[in-house]
Regions:
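Entry/capping segment at the start of metal-dependent catalytic domains
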Residues: 13-55
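A subset of signal/propeptide-processing and intrinsically disordered low-complexity segments
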Residues: 1-2, 24, 117, 195
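Short, basic/hydrophobic alpha-helical segments
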Residues: 95-109
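N-terminal amphipathic/basic-hydrophobic helices that include classical n-h-c signal peptides
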Residues: 1-17
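Metal-dependent phosphoesterase core characteristic of DEDDh/y 3'-5' exonuclease domains
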Residues: 40-45, 49-83, 105-212
Length: 212
């Protein structure tokens, strides 16, 4: 039953894509202080809005969010992102300021929020962020024509069902891998700074164009 529900949800988002029911995509990515959506915090948010043909609309967002004093980031997160807590405090928005930007400027009506593994990771951080700041944690992803879409699942489906025309990477043991930075490398897509949120967003848009 769960697999049927999952398939139905993915089919709904696919229909929205090909029919143009929604007006814009907003591709986004997060860099966080750790892996727990409940206990860790967003340190960097980047995103770019496009039309339904993946043409950019307006300027991209690339925002730092100040870590609060009682959040201790994991050393692994700092090594991967290169973002220090001090940098977020010096240059970043407070969570209250950041969540207002998300609510009023980014996740606007008729926006499809798109990411890579976002349904299982990034979206959960956004939900906890809204909850902590007294906003509804779900409306940003369903109300007034809003929805969300995970390109990792599309990549997996494409690799399994229609792999032609795309170079598919394997890991050091020869096993299939769908890591974004390896897909971009295999297909000659510019991705100079993996794990920088804006670089990941631009790479994700290019991979989406490749699949399309």
């Amino acid at each position: 039953f769960n697999s049927i529900v999952d398939y139905a949800l993915k089919w709904r988002f696919f229909v929205m894509l090909v029919t143009g029911m929604a007006q814009t995509f907003f591709f986004y990515d997060l860099e966080t202080s750790g892996l727990s959506a409940r206990d860790d915090r967003i340190m960097q948010f980047a995103g770019r809005r496009t039309d339904m043909d993946f043409n950019p609309i307006g300027e991209p967002y690339n925002l730092l969010v100040a870590l609060n004093d009682d959040t201790i980031p994991s050393p692994e997160a700092l090594l991967v992102t290169g973002i220090s807590p001090q940098k977020t405090v010096d240059e970043g928005y407070t969570e209250a300021q950041f969540v207002k930007i998300l609510n009023e400027e980014i996740f606007t009506p008729d926006t499809i929020a798109v990411g890579f593994n976002n349904v299982r990771f990034d979206d959960e951080f956004v939900r906890h962020l809204f909850w902590r700041n007294f906003y509804d944690p779900y409306e940003w992803s369903y109300k007034d024509g809003r929805s969300r879409w995970d390109l990792l699942d599309v990549v997996r489906m494409t690799r399994a069902l229609r792999p032609e025309g795309i170079e598919w990477p394997v890991d050091g043991e020869g096993k299939p891998t769908n890591r974004l930075e390896l897909i971009t490398k295999a297909n000659g897509i510019a991705h100079e700074n993996a794990h920088d949120a804006l670089s990941d967003v631009d790479a994700l848009i290019d991979v989406t164009k490749l699949i399309n």
